[in-house]
């Protein structure tokens, strides 16, 4: 007997007028300042932007949290907005029934208390949680768009399984960091088809937790080069003096590194080499010849990011600027892109292949650093090719935060979400 193929979930009422698309929020934890707060709270109470406070076009109707501690705000926010907190992922997607009953899923598998791998990487149970989401789709014979925050999974094999399973079930996916949706100073976006020969990106923090942000920022720029994305042939992860040696020997372009750092307005005063106790870098060779370096320079750069590239023999650079606390409006622009992805039932300004590639680069880079003594790792499995989507990303074009990006936050009645 021929089985019915997967089909798009059909709402009981129209998504184009009668009501807002219903969203299930699946998250590790929901505490002040975590990604569930910075994304979910904006979808509950309003999206602060340079152009004012924007009312959400989607409605979170169900919530599931893996860990609930004394700082939890998720239960209270859900109750204030008539969203039910469910005991299982399946219940949150079916609203306690037997079949899929929401129009989209936002999955935030970040933060919380989880063990580390032998590589020193936090083993967030993303594949486990997403498999449970896919299982509901498979049982229901229907799918809806899924957004996965930051990255698909902590390991390449898990990420590839998630990607392949989503493709098998026809699930539209969007994944990634908020960095591609930050304001850029100066304003810089490569025209599609640009000839980029070398590029460097810099950021702070540890490679494990912050490297993915730097990679996502970098990839959203270089994927616009001539021929589109073609994938990566090798990755090398180095740290400590090996990073300084790579700069001195020309394996990392000092000119591009200096330009990327020069574009960053808020960095520590003094010598980079004296301030950074543990520099880390990924040296990336792309299949089409592009040579790239991703550096984490904690101590010199702190929650700041820069990018520079050689484009048609000219060096250009920019800073990707986070919006100030407590609004963190760069998440607002990520939310606007997620919302459009849901409303258009799968049109994404952040191709999931971008995130799959950055996941693989990061995992192989850390493996090179920890297991291979900094040697080059060949990556034929990262032959991931795609073209930048023709859906323009929504990101702020003003040079500095303005309007509601600097306004009152949180809204009246939600003061409890600010951690004292």
Model-derived features with residue positions:
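A structured beta-alpha segment of the ubiquitous adenosine-cofactor-binding alpha/beta core
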Residues: 81-115, 129-138
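Beta-strand-loop-alpha-helix segment that lines the small-molecule cofactor/substrate pocket
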Residues: 110-180
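C-terminal helix-rich "cap/oligomerization" subdomain common to oxidoreductases
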Residues: 3, 9-12, 16, 120-122, ...
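Rossmann-like dinucleotide-binding domain that binds NAD(P)(H)
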Residues: 199-290, 297-301, 360
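Redox-cofactor binding/interface segments in oxidoreductases and associated redox assembly factors
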Residues: 25, 103-107, 148
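Conserved acidic residues
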Residues: 61, 99-103, 197
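N-terminal Rossmann-like dinucleotide-binding module
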Residues: 5, 9-79, 199
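NAD(P)-dinucleotide binding in Rossmann-like oxidoreductases
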Residues: 268-354
């Amino acid at each position: 007997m021929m089985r019915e193929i997967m089909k798009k979930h059909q709402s009981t009422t129209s998504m184009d007028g009668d009501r807002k698309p219903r969203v299930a929020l699946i998250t590790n934890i929901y505490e002040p300042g975590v990604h569930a707060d910075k994304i979910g709270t904006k979808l509950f109470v309003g999206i602060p932007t340079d152009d004012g406070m924007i009312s959400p076009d989607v409605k979170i109707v169900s919530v599931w949290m893996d860990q609930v501690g004394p700082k939890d705000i998720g239960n209270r926010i859900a109750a204030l907005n008539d969203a039910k907190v469910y005991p299982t992922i399946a219940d949150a997607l079916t609203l306690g029934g037997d079949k899929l009953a929401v129009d989209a899923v936002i999955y935030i598998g970040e933060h919380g208390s989880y063990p580390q791998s032998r590589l020193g990487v936090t083993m967030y149970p993303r594949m486990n949680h997403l498999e449970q989401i896919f299982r509901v789709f498979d049982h229901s014979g229907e799918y809806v768009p899924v957004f996965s925050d930051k990255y698909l999974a902590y390991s390449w094999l898990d990420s590839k399984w998630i990607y392949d399973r989503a493709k098998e079930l026809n699930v539209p996916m969007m994944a990634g960091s908020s960095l591609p949706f930050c304001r850029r100073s100066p304003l810089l976006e490569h025209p599609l088809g640009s000839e980029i020969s070398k590029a460097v990106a810099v950021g702070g923090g540890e490679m494990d937790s912050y490297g993915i942000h730097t990679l996502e920022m970098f990839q959203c720029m270089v994927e616009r080069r001539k021929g589109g994305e073609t994938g990566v042939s090798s990755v090398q992860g180095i740290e400590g003096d090996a990073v300084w040696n790579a700069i001195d020997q020309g394996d990392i372009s000092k000119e591009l590194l200096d330009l990327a750092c020069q574009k960053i307005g808020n960095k520590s005063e003094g010598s980079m080499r004296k301030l950074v106790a543990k520099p880390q870098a990924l040296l990336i060779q792309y299949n089409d010849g592009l040579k790239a370096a991703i550096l984490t320079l904690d101590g010199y750069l702190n929650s700041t990011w820069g990018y520079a590239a050689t484009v048609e023999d000219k060096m250009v650079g920019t800073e990707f600027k986070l919006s100030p606390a407590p609004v963190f409006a760069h998440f607002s622009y990520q939310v606007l892109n997620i919302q459009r992805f849901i409303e258009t039932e799968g049109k994404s300004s952040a191709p999931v292949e971008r995130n799959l590639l950055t996941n693989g680069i990061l995992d192989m880079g850390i493996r090179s650093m920890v297991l291979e003594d900094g040697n080059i790792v060949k990556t034929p499995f990262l032959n991931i090719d795609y073209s930048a989507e023709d859906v323009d990303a929504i990101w702020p074009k003003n040079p500095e935060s303005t309007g509601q990006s600097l306004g009152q936050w949180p809204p009246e009645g939600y003061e409890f979400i600010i951690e004292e």
